[in-house]
UniProtKB/Swiss-Prot annotation:
Glycosylation site residues: N51, N196
Function: Plays an important role in the regulation of embryonic development, cell proliferation and cell differentiation. Required for normal branching morphogenesis. May play a role in wound healing.
Gene: FGF10
Subcellular location(s) of the protein: Secreted
Protein name: Fibroblast growth factor 10
GO biological process: actin cytoskeleton organization; angiogenesis; blood vessel remodeling; branch elongation involved in salivary gland morphogenesis; branching morphogenesis of an epithelial tube; bronchiole morphogenesis; bud elongation involved in lung branching; bud outgrowth involved in lung branching
InterPro entries according to UniProt: Fibroblast_GF_fam, IL1/FGF
UniProt source species: Homo sapiens
Length: 208
């Protein structure tokens, strides 16, 4: 290409010396450099902007919001055992009594957790057919029929455990939580707080 430019320049201006042709060539090269650099600069900046945009979606604060609450679709069903921070499996016996057990193979601790709406679940003991329920006084009991006492708000806490609060009832504006004390006995909802470890449970998968 440069040979053609030199030849063309010499033929177009035969009366000019060779150094002038070289000057024309130099001016041509200088004028083409900014365009090339500008195009190259755009190519280099574009991927960086894309990566920056992508990283904003995976920021720690964004990830934290996603892992703090469940978004199960209505009708989602899971079989689990709820293992409390106090080292008890929550169970609902055939007479409807709610308590904790140390026995890993207790049939009354196998629970069916069903999402009734976003963030709200129903917990039912498979072998006793009782729903986990909390009345307006904060007492845990087993209910044969699904009612408003059986609706529980399921939440993931910072330590990775779940909490289950009454969906319909509060005490003095405070949430009331499902909880087992250090002896495996249920605690009254009025005495519970979200930060109390007695209200923290690990959902453990039940293998058939």
């Amino acid at each position: 290409m440069w040979k053609w430019i030199l030849t063309h320049c010499a033929s177009a201006f035969p009366h000019l010396p060779g150094c002038c042709c070289c000057c024309f060539l130099l001016l041509f090269l200088v004028s083409s450099v900014p365009v090339t650099c500008q195009a190259l600069g755009q190519d280099m900046v574009s991927p960086e902007a894309t990566n920056s945009s992508s990283s904003s979606f995976s920021s720690p604060s964004s990830a934290g919001r996603h892992v703090r609450s469940y978004n199960h679709l209505q009708g989602d069903v899971r079989w689990r055992k709820l293992f409390s921070f106090t080292k008890y499996f929550l169970k609902i016996e055939k007479n409807g009594k709610v308590s904790g057990t140390k026995k890993e193979n207790c049939p009354y601790s196998i629970l069916e957790i069903t999402s009734v709406e976003i963030g709200v679940v129903a917990v039912k003991a498979i072998n006793s057919n009782y729903y986990l329920a909390m009345n307006k006084k904060g007492k845990l009991y087993g209910s044969k029929e699904f009612n408003n006492d059986c609706k529980l708000k399921e939440r993931i806490e910072e330590n990775g455990y779940n909490t289950y609060a009454s969906f319909n009832w509060q005490h003095n504006g405070r949430q009331m939580y499902v909880a087992l004390n250090g002896k495996g006995a249920p605690r009254r909802g009025q005495k519970t707080r979200r930060k109390n470890t007695s209200a923290h449970f690990l959902p453990m998968v039940v293998h058939s």
